[in-house]
Design a protein with these regions (language model features):
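Active-site segments that bind and position negatively charged phosphate/pyrophosphate groups
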Residues: 61-66, 83-107, 113, 117, ...
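Charge-dense, low-complexity intrinsically disordered segments
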Residues: 36, 90, 94, 98, ...
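Active-site/ligand-binding neighborhood in enzyme catalytic cores
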Residues: 68, 72-87, 140-155
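NAD(P)-dependent Rossmann-like dehydrogenase/reductase catalytic/cofactor-binding core
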Residues: 50, 101, 105-171
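Rossmann-fold dinucleotide-binding core
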Residues: 1-69, 74-75, 80, 84
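Generic recognition of short, well-ordered alpha-helical interface segments
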Residues: 40, 44, 69, 98-106, ...
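A short alpha-helix capping/helix-coil boundary motif
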Residues: 23-27, 37, 57, 85-88, ...
Length: 171
């Protein structure tokens, strides 16, 4: 609100990073950057970021991009943090897998009511994740366990890292 719509460009980063110490980060997976269209600088920003090798993509609908990022980050994030489990352990447990799928279904239902569509983000197949979450557990669970467990490069979800580091604020 302080900047107003003219001062903000919606965006998302799908790269995976690790914080080694204050001011010291390492890029674990270079996926890309999403920028919402609609701002006078959006096209130029995408071009500059892409020229810098950041695999930038323009998204015509900011809501689709932002909710798709939420959907991509949802699996095994809060559950892993609360229960101090890895994402693979969460998805290996039948009851927790069911809980995760119910959370995904709820997010997809909210998106549908608002006319928001899942969309793939840079090197992040969100539409496939949305599709897989609707498959029977015997088909989807082994695939999602591997994808969610390995999709973070062996790193725990950010919420888990923040919670167990005693941080009072999280992304």
């Amino acid at each position: 609100e302080a900047l107003g719509p003219a001062g903000v460009i919606a965006g998302t980063v799908t790269c995976s990073i690790a914080r080694l110490s204050a001011g010291d980060i390492v890029l674990e997976k270079a996926r890309g950057v999403g920028i919402a269209a609609g701002h006078p600088l959006s096209e130029q920003l995408v071009a500059v970021l892409d020229a810098a090798g950041l695999n930038a993509h323009r998204y015509p609908r900011a809501g689709d991009m932002k909710w798709s990022k939420l959907l991509a980050n949802l699996p095994a994030s809060a559950t892993a943090a609360i229960l101090d489990m890895t994402p693979a352990e969460v998805f290996a447990h039948p009851g927790l897998y069911d809980l995760e799928m119910r959370m995904s279904h709820e997010a997809l239902a909210v998106m549908a009511v608002q006319g928001i569509r899942p969309t793939d983000l840079p090197r992040t197949p969100v539409r496939l994740l949305a599709f897989a979450s609707r498959l029977p557990a015997f088909l989807a669970r082994p695939v999602l366990k591997k994808a969610v467990g390995g999709g973070r490069g062996g790193k725990m979800p950010s919420f888990h890292i923040d919670l167990h580091a005693g941080r009072k604020k999280s992304e």
